[in-house]
UniProtKB/Swiss-Prot annotation:
Disulphide linkage map: none
Database matches in Gene3D superfamilies: ApbE-like domains (3.10.520.10)
Cleavable signal peptide: none
NCBIfam families: PRK04334.1-4
Protein name as catalogued: UPF0280 protein Memar_1519
Organism: Methanoculleus marisnigri (strain ATCC 35101 / DSM 1498 / JR1)
Source taxon at top rank: Archaea
Amino acid sequence: MIREHFEFRQTITTILADDRGHIEAAKSGMLAARREVERQIAGDPYFSATLEPYTPNNPANVPASMARAAAEAGVGPMAAVAGAIARAGVEAMAGAGAAFGLVDNGGDIALVSNREVKIGIYAGASPLSGRFAFLIPPGEEILGICTSSATVGPSISFGTADAVTVFSPDVAAADAWATAICNRITADDTSVLDDLPKTGVLGVLAVIGDAVVRWGDLPPIVRARVDERLITAGSDWQYYGRS
């Protein structure tokens, strides 16, 4: 298996593939998706500024998918950008003939796989962090596995959860819902899960300190040791410890 770190401006990714050509396909797919998003922002700056649902006029495919997913989750379109770009990368890999391909865009993962894959659960200072992993079964369709955190990384969050991971066949939706849930969920208040759509979101795992909240259908969770060196991050990665 080939593992490659790929960065372009704000897009910071890890790509996994069996073939060098599939790595290059992923890069091309992500860059094409970025161009669509950049054109949208250039002509409509509000698209990138708002933290609320927003429907742009005549968007291209990628911005449109972001806006739809974000509107359903009640967040701004940019909450879905990492997932949308990751999906574009894996779609390009599959189009190039890949039976296995993974793009991790800063914790927002798109995956197509002909084998079992372990995805580690990293949750900052939680005592559960780095000790478990999801065991993802093989699947011919693209799967989104997106994680949001209020305590790890530079992304905007209004919550307290150490990690919220959402599974969905729509990677942009997984990304948007991870953000929305992370903004609101606490160990004592899980009412945000009542807002999840009846279809589209497969399962949710939230880690808040030493508390765990599960919703829907999740893949098996197994004991594992997460190697933090494999976490996809740029030079500005950081852990925000609680005071």
